[in-house]
């Protein structure tokens, strides 16, 4: 404790001007001679160097000068005794600080160091400063270690060397310097003790390195002020920032033992800047795989360019984690989308490129592309300004030629699009408070296994998670909440999207999403969507609903299992196919929809839960499995659960194969779709040909291709009521709509038959 500050103690002796009777020629104790008597010293009131001093003639081997007053020595207190002297005449003496230790019984303590370092007064008239530190502990810099026994002391100087020298001595001062040694006691190191200057300009790199090297397990303290650091700095000690750092954008601060966001915020005095520097360190150090935000909120007034924060690299493929915090969008000016329009050419021979692009310099990478023949969620992945071309995230289904496009660049709290490749990045337990002004996360152009876990995306203006390239390959979204900013907006008027993905192997698991225009658009294959609840209702009675999940690859090879599909539907398209007409391949194929709860309320009767929308002709459907789902409509019924949107084209119903529609439950659904479909037929009047209706209960009102089983429900009888035992043969695809089957008997018969009909 610095008692001179906390208790107002003044340890300095009385100045010489008070009188030489305060100054002993011996130990300073009672009854010793003072200089007003012995006469080797006189007071000099005016000196060109000292405000007032004494002139002393050295007459003894050790000429002593001690203050007769008692200088207290509180516990854990360190005192610096200091004066200035100059030789006026005579031989060259030496000088040192000295003291006489006394205990609580007013007894001399002799087992202590009685004096400090000695210095010679070599040059006539030259001012020499002599100092010594006295204190209880054996610490670096303590000259006179007195331990715990002394209670007070009589301090002054000794003059040694040849007699006859004449010296002048300035007033002796005693200063409490305990704070220097309290750093040792408190296990801290102050960077200022190693040359750091808090002026915001002087380069303090070497001082910080020296303090870190000297810490040896202690904590490094950066006191109040602004410290410039010119290059990347690594501190291996624990560190505490009371002041702030000024560093170039390219210089990284690596805090190996204090690596957390609160420390970086303290280091840079700003939440956003602290986060940028912490992320820069995360990608420039192998000491940590995760950045703990410490529950802090980072207020963001403009998008954070995550690659610019790192600056020195645009590729990173090792696992890194950011966890446990919140990003809060502030203000509005930094979040307004940039909108550019321009003509451009498109050819299916270069299906991912726009060429001859107008205003290309103003079009930003990551812009959403809109125009005639452009599918949903197509983005600018890269651009070549000199060549006038733009690379697209997906092909366009009907845009051949030269036309006008609109390019809209939305702004994101965390924007990773500057990375050419970024893989294995995890975001855990983070809340993105978009505040209806910002969007949440834009992914890198290329990357693997982006993973978002237990995060909240709240009120994004347009987008939650956006992929502009293939940075979504293998993306995992687990246990996240997507909260709309459009709860009071009618479903068909909403503009926000929870997330999109362009590449394959995406997994959406156990998420919750409320009242977006769409929850997710997935343009790749091999997706797994399980355990999610996505709700998109509104207050419009008999209103329309939009897709919750959109699959835009015809050969999707995906599974949708165990979800709660609430007032929305699953839409399956091929809008990202540059040749949308079917010519070869699988067409719409390989989709499993199983064990889901489908619910709608107060919707239009033509609403459906599963919608296929071909953007080209002649497509079939194959390897579709819709099993063990609950389909329920409340506050009104709907006609059927599945449908084909024929805006651009219908499906080719002769090409429906391997379709399984069974084990589903239907409530308030007029047509309970099944395949295989069991049809019960009663033939009241005898006839050799029975025609059976499927009542549009085969999937997608498809053809009744064949009968796979027959089971008489009562005895088949002839017109004369004789029993008939022969088996009829069957004919499929009967009638103008090919949705009937025929049973042909060898004679006129009547009765009741259960028939299993399949489309495939």
Name each model-derived stretch.
Residues 673-760:
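Extracellular attachment/recognition segments
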Residues 60-97, 130-132, 172, 694:
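Extra-cytoplasmic beta-strand recognition segments
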Residues 34-64:
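Short carbohydrate-recognition loop motifs
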């Amino acid at each position: 404790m610095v008692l001179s500050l906390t208790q107002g103690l003044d340890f300095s002796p009385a100045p010489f001007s008070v009188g030489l009777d305060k100054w002993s020629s011996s130990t300073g104790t009672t009854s010793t001679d003072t200089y007003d008597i012995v006469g080797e010293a006189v007071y000099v009131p005016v000196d060109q160097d000292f405000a007032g001093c004494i002139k002393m003639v050295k007459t003894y081997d050790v000429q002593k000068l001690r203050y007769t007053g008692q200088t207290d020595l509180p516990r854990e207190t360190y005192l610096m005794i200091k004066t200035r002297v100059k030789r006026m005449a005579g031989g060259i003496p030496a000088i040192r600080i000295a003291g006489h230790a006394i205990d609580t019984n007013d007894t001399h303590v002799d087992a202590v160091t009685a004096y400090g370092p000695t210095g010679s007064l070599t040059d006539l008239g030259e001012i020499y400063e002599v100092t010594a530190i006295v204190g209880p502990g054996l610490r670096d810099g303590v000259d006179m270690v007195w331990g715990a026994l002394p209670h007070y002391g009589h301090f002054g100087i000794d003059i040694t060397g040849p007699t006859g020298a004449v010296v002048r001595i300035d007033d002796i001062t005693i200063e409490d310097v305990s704070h220097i040694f309290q750093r040792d006691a408190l296990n801290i190191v102050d960077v200022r003790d190693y040359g750091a200057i808090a002026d915001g300009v002087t380069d303090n790199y070497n001082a910080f390195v020296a303090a870190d090297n000297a810490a040896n397990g202690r904590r490094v303290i950066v006191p109040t002020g602004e410290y410039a650091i010119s290059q990347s700095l690594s501190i291996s000690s624990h560190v505490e920032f009371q002041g702030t750092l000024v560093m170039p954008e390219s210089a990284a601060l690596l805090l190996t033992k204090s690596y957390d966001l609160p420390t970086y915020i303290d280091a840079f005095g700003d939440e956003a800047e602290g986060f940028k520097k912490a992320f820069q360190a995360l990608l420039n150090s192998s000491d940590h795989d995760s950045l703990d935000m410490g529950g802090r909120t980072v207020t963001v007034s403009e998008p954070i360019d995550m690659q610019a924060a790192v600056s020195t690299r645009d590729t990173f493929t090792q696992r890194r984690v950011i966890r446990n915090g919140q990003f809060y969008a502030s203000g509005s000016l930094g979040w307004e989308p940039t909108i550019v329009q321009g003509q451009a050419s498109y050819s299916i021979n270069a299906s991912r490129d726009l060429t001859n692009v107008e205003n290309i310099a103003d079009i930003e990478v990551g812009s959403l592309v809109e125009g005639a023949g452009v599918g949903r969620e197509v983005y600018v992945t890269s651009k070549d300004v000199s060549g006038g071309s733009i690379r697209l995230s997906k092909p366009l289904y009907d845009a051949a030629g030269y036309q006008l496009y609109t390019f809209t660049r939305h702004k994101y709290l965390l924007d990773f699009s500057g990375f050419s490749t970024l893989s294995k990045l995890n975001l855990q337990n983070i809340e993105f408070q978009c505040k209806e002004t910002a969007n949440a996360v834009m992914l890198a152009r290329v990357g693997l296994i982006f993973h978002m876990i237990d995060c909240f995306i709240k009120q994004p203006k347009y987008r939650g998670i956006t992929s502009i390239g293939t940075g979504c390959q293998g993306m995992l979204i687990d246990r996240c909440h997507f909260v709309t900013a459009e709860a009071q907006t009618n479903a068909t008027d909403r503009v926000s999207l929870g997330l999109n993905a362009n590449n394959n192997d995406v997994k959406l698991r156990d998420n919750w999403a409320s009242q977006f225009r769409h929850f997710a658009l997935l343009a790749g294959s091999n997706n797994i969507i399980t355990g999610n609840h996505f709700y998109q209702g509104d207050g419009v009675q008999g209103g329309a609903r939009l897709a919750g999940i959109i699959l835009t690859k015809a050969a999707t090879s995906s599974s949708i299992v165990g979800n709660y599909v609430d007032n929305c539907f699953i839409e399956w398209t091929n809008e990202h196919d540059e040749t949308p007409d079917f010519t070869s391949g699988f067409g719409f194929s390989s989709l499993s929809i199983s064990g889901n709860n489908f619910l709608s309320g107060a919707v239009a009767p033509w609403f459906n839960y599963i919608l296929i929308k071909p953007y080209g002709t002649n497509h079939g459907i194959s390897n579709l499995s819709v099993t063990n789902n609950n389909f329920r409509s409340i506050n009104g019924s709907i006609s059927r659960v599945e449908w084909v949107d024929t805006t651009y084209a219908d499906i080719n119903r002769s090409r429906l194969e391997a379709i399984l529609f069974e084990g589903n439950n239907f409530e308030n659904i007029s047509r309970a779709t099944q395949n295989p479909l069991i049809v019960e037929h009663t033939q009241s009047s005898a006839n050799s040909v029975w025609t059976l209706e499927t009542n549009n209960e085969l999937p997608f009102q498809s053809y009744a291709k064949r009968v796979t089983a027959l089971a008489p429900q009562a005895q088949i009888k002839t017109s004369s009521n004789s029993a008939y035992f022969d088996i009829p043969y069957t004919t499929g695809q009967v009638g103008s709509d090919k949705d009937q089957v025929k049973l042909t008997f060898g004679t006129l018969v009547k009765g009741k038959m259960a028939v299993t009909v399949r489309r495939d």
